[in-house]
Structure formats: C-alpha cells, structure tokens
C-alpha cells in the first residue's frame, strides 16, 4: 500500500501512477500465462492506482492545493 501520499508532489504522483499501471499490466499478463505468486497483488495495485487518480483529480478541480 502507498504510504504518505500527501508528502508527494503532483509530478511524483503522476510518475508513481505510471509505474503502478505498468506493474499492473505486467501482472495481468502473468495471470493470463498462469504464473502469479500473489493474486491479491492485482487488487492492491488497482486500488493504489485509484487512490492516486483520486488525489490527482482533487488537485485538478481545486479541492487540494499544490
């Protein structure tokens, strides 16, 4: 799980979201092939991406200030 999201800058959050999306896609491909050590990791990644998307959107609409 992501810790201290409030400490990250907006650009760091966008970069972190991109790396999490890549990791999620890799995990999806491994699931299709059939070799996944921790199937719950997919759910955790999806939720972390959603958390980051929410915070980034809050910055975009002005709920959070930079």
From Swiss-Prot:
Keywords in alphabetical order: Ribonucleoprotein, Ribosomal protein
Statement: the UniProt record of this protein carries the keyword Ribonucleoprotein: yes
A Pfam family the protein falls into: Ribosomal_L29
GO cellular component, one term: ribosome
Top-level division of the source organism's lineage: Bacteria
GO biological process: translation
Gene Ontology terms, MF aspect: structural constituent of ribosome
Coiled coil: none
Matches recorded under CDD domains: Ribosomal_L29_HIP (cd00427)
Family indicated by similarity: Belongs to the universal ribosomal protein uL29 family.
Database matches in HAMAP family: Ribosomal_uL29
Descriptive protein name: Large ribosomal subunit protein uL29
Annotated source species: Borrelia duttonii (strain Ly)
Phylogenetic placement of the source organism: Bacteria, Pseudomonadati, Spirochaetota, Spirochaetia, Spirochaetales
């Amino acid at each position: 799980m992501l810790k201290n999201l409030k400490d990250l800058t907006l650009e760091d959050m966008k970069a972190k979201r991109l790396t999490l999306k890549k990791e999620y896609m890799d995990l999806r491909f491994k699931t299709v092939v059939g070799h996944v050590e921790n199937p719950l990791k997919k759910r955790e990644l999806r939720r972390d991406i959603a958390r980051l998307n929410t915070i980034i959107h809050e910055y975009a609409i002005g709920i959070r200030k930079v």
